[in-house]
């Protein structure tokens, strides 16, 4: 981080000021790494929240709705939030002692949700300051996932907001915050392709871009039986059908691995398949970042050995195979240590499963931010063949 000026600036703002920050940047620029560094090394009392259960689990945080006990209905500015039930004494203490609120995947957070958070924090802290005086670290890419707004919600919210995006929050508009955009991509080295991706991302596609991409179009492209291509599809059903069909064609013994859950872990927040059926020869994708850097979220490989107790995956152009161990994800909630007055994470439950999924196909939505060596995009029933594809 010391060598990256943008990350260093972000760290200084978080650690040495009370100014709120919107940290953005395309996939692969270090947003997740920065979040991990803040959690490990910052001296501030913090909590991490995210708009969805899966995003919260991946960030080792909790959902916005669960922590702030928000109702499912939209929030109308200048009204009072009515929590689903009364805040516990400890929850109130956490909010009163909080220094830093980290919101991951901020692009998915609606403006009214941010205003609801503001209303709650003002109630328990400094009433005249936005968000009760709490510093915000908002992390996300506005050009990836967007807020989910139902038609009836949009009709109501349009009376108060120009857009449903978080930056239209009344509270945020009255807050002085800085925007830091990370620009160096660490997962993609092809400069020509980076430029094309950025043109698509920013809506500035040129004729030259299309000419380069069209050279990759192969109408009758067949990836071959043992290739590591992955189909990017529009719907789960299509991806599941491709994966099931490909797995069935492998004439090897199938092994079923059931996840182990302990304590409280909501089913809609499961980070992996509860039942995982695999065979030797199956193409798989890692769905977790390995701390020892043997694999990363989105890395593709093929199972070269499997039994009831062991899975070995070999990745393209790598001599050393990976013996995969089950990964444990935690469902946490925040508590206040009465003695130290520090905010601590309490593990409510765990989910343990091999960090793998079948990977002949995946939906475009689930592939956000992942890096693939080879991909086939199903676009309007035509196949577009790309190398070194990183979806933005």
Question: What is each of the regions a protein language model found here?
Answer:
Residues 1-391:
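Conserved ATP-binding/catalytic motifs of P-loop helicase motor domains
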